[in-house]
């Protein structure tokens, strides 16, 4: 029992009792939107419960865009289409004004697009490999010889810089969810054009959630566009500049986060706009 309260209830005090801290005010990046980074023009693609249907949207440098909707409503397909991981049935994708509609993550990646999946161990990291071994996979080399000493030093730097609670020889499955996410974020380059993230704070404690968003907002201040999905509407409103609501594979609401609230987003998620 963390506390007790009699009516009338104070919402802020209840949240403090439940989570150990009062609710956080908006921590949006609020960067002026720059040039076009990503543009989808009438894109349709299969997947999930409803796929993605006739989607047209533009994302600009420095924007943080949150994707809301029931699971399977199109958010995951949208992110994977934007990353070059899913084929198109119709439409086209532009990156910084250049058409790039082939289903090829490496081609998108060469243009500064990076995708961080929700399934950290299933898609993001390799179970049974250590932090050092992950660092070794990232290093450029001209021979088949694995540069373990250099990789161990690199792993140590990542652990220190990202405050990961682990050691270079720690297998990644032994890390907590928050530390797995910190490790994944440590693999990103310093200046991506576009970051696409599925549920980046899934299962994390409040301290880790705040750390993740402080880190991600440091990218948008350098001009990176960020698009992320989350089932938590409060989180989306706290950190995003703009919200896209998906319903049955379509974007049915595109609104500035400062101009909406949980009730309006909830209605849109139910298809009521």
Please provide the spans of the model-predicted regions.
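Glycine-rich phosphate-binding loops of nucleotide-dependent enzymes
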Residues: 1-273
